[in-house]
Amino acid sequence: MAEEIIVALFPCTFAEGGECTVPAGSRVVLGLGWAAKNRGLVQNFLQAQTTTISIDDAAPVDISDSYSAIGPFPDGGFATRIRHDTGVTLSAGESLQVDGMLAVSHVVPDGVIDETTNRQAFFRPEQPLSIHCRITATA
């Protein structure tokens, strides 16, 4: 059985320019999560969110019900996560394109302060998060 490699979709999309690499022979597991300063804010997110993904331009799949139970961080805060096994094992040079959308039905605060405005940050229905990550296997 191929070794699982978890690809964190938010870092791939927002910090790594939408591209990441995994070792050849890896089975790709997608990771996604939401964190906030208290359990109630995470529960609010879970009740408001719709999360979909598409792999290699296939029809989008609704994974909204795949979030884990809410759990605490050791240093404070709470999170819920998705671990989505694609079932795909990549050989050297092969790639997988993941596209998705995370939207909410109402304004969701996450309890953090925006470093630019020094105000609380909010996730809004009119500003869904687009997920785009090309995962390529290297030798």
What do these predicted regions represent?
Residues 92-94:
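Aromatic-rich surface patch/π-platform used for binding flat ligands and interfaces
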Residues 1-55, 59-88, 97-139:
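Beta-strand-rich recognition domains
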